[in-house]
Design a protein with these regions (language model features):
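Contiguous transmembrane helix-bundle modules in multi-pass membrane proteins
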Residues: 2-4, 9-10, 163-173, 180, ...
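Hydrophobic alpha-helical membrane-insertion signals
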Residues: 12-90, 265-274, 292, 339, ...
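Membrane-interface coil-to-helix junctions
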Residues: 36-129, 148-171, 175, 281-332, ...
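Transmembrane helix irregularities
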Residues: 107, 152, 202-210, 254-256, ...
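Transmembrane-helix signature of polytopic, membrane-embedded enzymes
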Residues: 129-152, 187-193
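Transmembrane-helix signature of membrane-embedded glycosylation machinery that interfaces
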Residues: 129-137, 178-181, 185, 342, ...
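Polar, glycine-rich mid-to-C-terminal structural blocks
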Residues: 211, 241-291
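Soluble catalytic regions of membrane-associated enzymes that act on cell-envelope
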Residues: 301-302, 309-322, 326, 460-465, ...
Length: 654
């Protein structure tokens, strides 16, 4: 079978090679991406420190420790008795069987594993974007700049704040997956499809099913496009081979990930997320991306985020109306090149494809804020089992980074052609428009700053300052592009300047989402409550009762966290996304959350706060026998409790 040639680079043969092809080869680029990832996360590897992450500290760390302990003992864990009354391990094994996770567990203490995962995954993000850009015909330095832009793009880097390793494992593999699919369809070789299978298997082994669903959906759209783009629809033999290899790679990826999915298949019907028809449209559209999130692609302060500095407790963004621990920021380079690309790269069929994919992903991310989601909800199989449609935004951010690479490559082609003809760049190429388009982006940002005002409350960062920061970096990118296209700056200087501006720009925002905290030995040391519970007879369960406005014992999340797991203490609830549905119904299923404990708390009219000699206390009246039947012997609360069947047995940190 004849092989299809890669997309041609249209630079003139008369262009100076030293200026069009800089020595940014694969090995150098790979080394730079790795060093940048290691430098970024290095503080988490210091002695006595570990990654800070809201979900990580509430739940993930303890499951990391649980698996490491069981694997170290040579056993395969099947049941977790410590959270939500107990559940099978395969209810959500997380990234336990992911190769990067397993390697980290083999090399490092548990408290360092998540940092290791992030270093490897963000290295692969930059490397994958470099390879994809090269596969699409971009010169090496353009691919390198694009790699920086995606490696540090806001949405994936901001997931670090919660410690969402699964989301990051999937989204950072998107460029590699697209690279292998393109190379496979273009060449007809087996090896690229094997690469696609391995890449997809790594994503699936994260057990982040929702993000993997979005990656598969985007990959399917990409593959169909490529079959037509490379003319395989006119060659039945080549078409059949490519389709067979494509489906075979997906099947092989699921086979590699079957350690997770085969046991999980039988659990779906027992899960709160496995209800026939899902949990309804309102549940599925919860945590939709707000329309203001579109502006956050340029100015993350505009939509805000509900994150704080864990050390100072000061807000790091203006308050968000909902619950938001991430940002949509893609950086000034990507936004300026998006505007420039409309004028210069529109004829590129790949640019138009990724523009369409970005629009599709954005319309999905907006969820319930657009009527289009009802169409997706009805037409796309399995979508009704998910919530938080804003998770698909990583596909949009990825698409925008690819579009930036294609636009920059087009500018490089026009610049080389104008130099070869020995005429001014402005004469026929129209490159002078780059300056005016960039200045238009800067002017829009300055206008936004004038209209934005300050933070929503005292002590919050200013929205106006966010607009001005974007204006400054957009101005820097515009100046660099103008100097380069006007032949006042060489390609080496342009590559260094654009890469440096992009790295600095994204680093400033990303760093708000990266923090470290005390290492496990100090952070998770046994407190007085644990010391008391360890002296009590077992088996029994503990209910860490969340009281609004007060912290939860054990550094837990809204349901108490999984801190007691370290000491073999079983809980009524904990931190877990997919407990047994029958247990959830027993303690009280929620509408927006998995559980609201209404059965254990009792009727709404029996709940309240009363004044006692010790201050305010919580009154509740659970249904008779429910606590006893659940073997709940102790309730841990940060506020006094008023109930005739309870007596205080310990008072200390809770």
């Amino acid at each position: 079978m004849a092989k299809t040639a890669p997309p041609p680079r249209r630079a003139s043969a008369l262009a100076a090679p030293a200026d069009t092809e800089l020595p940014m080869r694969f090995g150098i680029a790979a080394a730079v991406f790795f060093v940048l990832a290691l430098l970024y996360f290095f503080p988490s590897f210091l002695p006595g420190r570990q990654m800070y992450g809201t979900d990580y500290l509430a739940g993930s760390y303890f499951f990391y420790d649980f698996f490491a302990d069981r694997f170290g003992a040579g056993t395969l864990p099947k049941w977790v008795p410590y959270v939500y009354g107990g559940m099978p391990v395969y209810a959500n094994p997380g990234s336990a069987y992911h190769p990067v996770h397993l390697l980290g567990e083999a090399l490092l203490p548990t408290g360092k594993v998540i940092g290791f995962i992030f270093v490897v995954q963000f290295w692969l993000a930059g490397l994958g974007m470099y390879l994809l850009a090269r596969e699409l015909g971009c010169r090496a330095w353009v691919a390198f700049v694009a790699g920086i832009a995606f490696q540090f793009t806001g949405v994936t880097m901001s997931w670090v704040y919660a410690g969402h390793d699964g989301r990051i494992m999937v989204s950072t593999m998107a460029p590699l997956f697209f690279h292998f699919l393109h190379r496979g369809v273009r060449t007809g070789s087996v090896a690229p499809f094997a690469g696609a299978a391995a890449t997809l298997a790594f994503a699936l082994l994260s057990f982040q099913i929702q993000n993997s669903y979005y990656l598969l959906l985007a990959g399917f759209i990409w593959a169909v496009f490529l079959l037509f783009r490379h003319g395989l629809h006119r060659r039945p033999g080549a078409l059949g081979k490519a389709v067979a290899l494509g489906f075979g790679s997906v099947a092989f990826a699921f086979l590699l990930a079957s350690v997770n999915f085969l046991p999980f298949r039988d659990y779906v019907g027992e899960s709160p997320r496995g209800m026939q028809g899902g949990r309804g449209y309102e549940y599925s559209t919860s945590y939709s991306m707000p329309p203001a999130g579109l502006l956050s692609m340029a100015v993350p302060e505009q939509a805000g985020a509900s994150i704080i500095d864990p050390d100072t407790q000061q807000p790091l963004f203006p308050a968000n109306a909902g619950f938001k621990l991430h940002t949509e920021y893609v950086g000034a380079l990507v936004m300026v090149l998006l505007a420039v690309g409309v004028a210069f790269a529109w004829r590129n069929v790949y640019w138009r494809f990724f523009a369409g994919l970005a629009v599709f992903a954005l319309s999905m991310a907006l969820g319930g804020n657009t009527p289009l989601y009802r169409l997706y909800y009805a037409a796309l199989p399995g979508l009704n089992r998910f919530r938080a449609p804003d998770l698909v935004y990583f596909v949009a951010a990825f698409s925008l980074a690819v579009m930036a690479a294609l636009t920059l490559e087009r500018l490089a082609e026009l610049r080389a052609a104008s130099a070869a003809r020995r005429i001014g760049a402005a004469d026929e190429s129209g490159l002078q428009k780059v300056l005016w388009i960039g200045l238009g982006v800067v002017a829009f940002a300055v206008l936004g700053s004038m209209m934005a005002g300050g933070g929503a409350a005292a002590g919050e960062p200013s929205r106006a300052a966010g607009w001005m920061r974007f204006a400054i970096f957009a101005g820097g990118v515009t100046a660099a592009l103008w100097a380069w296209t006007a032949h006042k700056l060489g390609s080496l200087g342009a590559a260094a300047l654009l890469a440096g501006l992009t790295l600095t720009d994204l680093w400033i925002i990303d760093r708000r989402f990266f923090h470290t905290t005390d290492g496990p030995a100090q952070a998770f040391a046994a407190d007085d409550v644990v010391a008391f519970l360890e002296t009590q007879p077992r088996p029994s369960r503990v209910w860490a009762l969340s009281v609004p406005g007060l912290p939860v014992w054990g550094r837990g999340g809204s349901k108490g966290g999984d801190y007691p797991m370290l000491f073999g203490i079983e809980q009524v609830a904990g931190e877990h996304p997919n407990p047994l549905q029958r247990w959830v119904e027993y303690i009280g299923a929620g509408t927006q959350e998995i559980t609201d404990f209404h059965n254990l708390l009792g009727p709404q009219d029996s709940l309240g706060v009363v004044q006692t000699q010790e201050g305010q206390a919580l009154v509740f009246n659970p249904r008779p026998g429910l606590l006893e039947a659940a073997n709940v012997r102790y309730i841990v609360s940060m506020a006094p409790l008023v109930h005739p069947g309870l007596r205080e047995v310990h008072r200390g940190s809770a």
